[in-house]
């Protein structure tokens, strides 16, 4: 049975919740975490980590198939799908076990059950009421169907898509954002016939237009049938198939994945009991220190505004705890949070797109460079990758960075760091980069923005 009171109680043990709990323990707070389902939350168990485990398999398979381009002769690789799923489970177990170990190491009590608010400073779990000076709600988000349909049968969400019982022959994905594009890219390379639908006019519609174009070409090269500006309608599911129409044309697939967004998971929190207010869009209202309208109650992650990203939730958890401890904190500049999409080709980005910068009235300067312009692009066999820097002309401000291609999800961090340290694209252009590396493409994009591109 849990103790009657704690300094800090965190509801939810995902990347936001468990990081908040560990930081609270580091600051000397008596801390407990309430988790109803699995340690590590959805990210570690059914979303981010399982997705990347399967995507890594698809990456390895692609490398084997392309080995002949590098002078290595191999036959057509054989896919062992049960082994892929077994490795996926091993990865999950390793990482969730690591989180449980960190709880133990830091003296954090894990309480299994459904946590909710009873009043300001009081939570309920398993019929017990527990007092806490600080409560942090970090319950994440849940899948959301598209209008006119519901989940069930052969209509599934992104979480189920990464744990299918068998490798499907056919699959349709509705929504070509980050999650949908990752699912489509993974299964297409594993041999599935994939249909990808997007209601807007391009894939990855939140990314810069130039990046979306490169990604769409890459997805089509993998055999994916991409349909933009298209709605899926008349969805019907049977025991073994899902039928639907697009533009009046009938289709039939083994699975239909809805990847069009998620909703905050607040149903069991009893927020009214503590006076926690929701915004019109259903998100919890918070200030820059993650404080809700209820004294001593904080909210983080997918429950609040900003991008629904694990690393953003983790940082918010630290901010909430440090504010509760009386330390100085600074609100997150959400536009500068890096985004990483692990479809092939990879995408890494932050900040404003070119269109957004122009709409906001900046005197915009753009620097672009394809990977093929630097030696490492040819060495790695990726000459079509692209680095794009969006800047402000007068002061050299770095407004946004957008990369598509090999290691884009790693390369973007350089531009994020330059921005955080108040540097601009002239600094990117002048910093010496190792040779031959893909990071030289970032440097050259900085030079292009600054008006003195060397390799181009």
Per-range role (PLM):
Residues 9-11, 115, 130-140, 173-174, ...:
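Short hydrophobic core segments
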Residues 2-6, 22-29, 34-167, 200-204, ...:
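Glycine-rich flavin
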């Amino acid at each position: 049975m849990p103790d009657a009171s704690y300094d800090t109680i965190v509801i939810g043990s995902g990347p936001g919740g468990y990081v908040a709990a560990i930081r609270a323990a580091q600051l000397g707070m008596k801390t407990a975490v309430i988790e109803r389902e699995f340690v590590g939350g959805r990210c570690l168990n059914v979303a981010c980590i399982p997705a990347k485990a399967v995507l890594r398999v698809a990456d390895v398979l692609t490398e084997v198939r392309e080995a002949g381009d590098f002078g290595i002769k191999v036959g057509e690789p054989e896919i062992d799908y049960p082994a892929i799923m077994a490795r996926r489970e091993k990865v999950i177990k390793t990482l969730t076990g690591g989180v449980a170990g960190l709880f133990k190491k830091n003296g954090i009590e894990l309480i299994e059950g459904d946590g909710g608010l009873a009043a300001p400073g009081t939570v309920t779990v398993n019929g017990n009421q527990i007092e806490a000076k600080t409560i942090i709600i970090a319950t994440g988000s849940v899948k959301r169907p598209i209008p006119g349909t519901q989940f069930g049968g052969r209509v599934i969400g992104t979480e189920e898509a990464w744990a299918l019982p068998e490798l499907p022959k056919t699959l349709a994905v509705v929504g070509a954002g980050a999650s949908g594009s990752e699912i489509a890219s993974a299964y297409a390379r594993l041999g599935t016939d994939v249909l990808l639908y997007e209601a807007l006019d391009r894939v990855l519609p939140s990314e810069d237009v130039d990046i979306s174009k490169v990604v769409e070409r890459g997805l089509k090269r993998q055999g994916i049938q991409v349909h933009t500006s298209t709605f899926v309608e008349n969805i019907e599911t049977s025991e073994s198939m899902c039928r639907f129409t697009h533009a009046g044309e009938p289709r039939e697939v083994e699975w239909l994945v809805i990847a069009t967004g998620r909703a905050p998971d607040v149903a069991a929190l009893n927020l009214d009991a503590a006076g926690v207010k929701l915004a019109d869009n259903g998100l919890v209202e918070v200030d820059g220190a993650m404080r809700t309208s209820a004294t001593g109650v904080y909210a983080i992650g997918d429950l609040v505004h900003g991008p629904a990203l694990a690393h953003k939730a983790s940082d918010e958890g630290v901010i909430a705890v440090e504010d509760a401890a009386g330390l100085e904190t600074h609100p997150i500049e959400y536009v500068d949070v890096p985004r990483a999409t692990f479809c092939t080709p990879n995408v890494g980005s932050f900040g404003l797109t070119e269109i957004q910068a122009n709409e906001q009235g900046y005197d915009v300067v753009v620097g672009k460079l394809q990977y093929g312009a630097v030696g490492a692009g040819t060495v790695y066999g990726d000459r079509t990758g692209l680095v794009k820097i969006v800047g402000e002309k007068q002061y050299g401000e770095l407004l946004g960075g957008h990369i598509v291609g090999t290691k884009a999800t790693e390369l973007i961090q350089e531009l994020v760091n330059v921005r955080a340290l108040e540097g601009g694209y002239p600094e990117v252009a002048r910093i010496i980069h190792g040779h031959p590396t893909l990071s030289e493409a970032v440097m050259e994009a900085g030079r292009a923005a600054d008006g003195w591109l060397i390799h181009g």
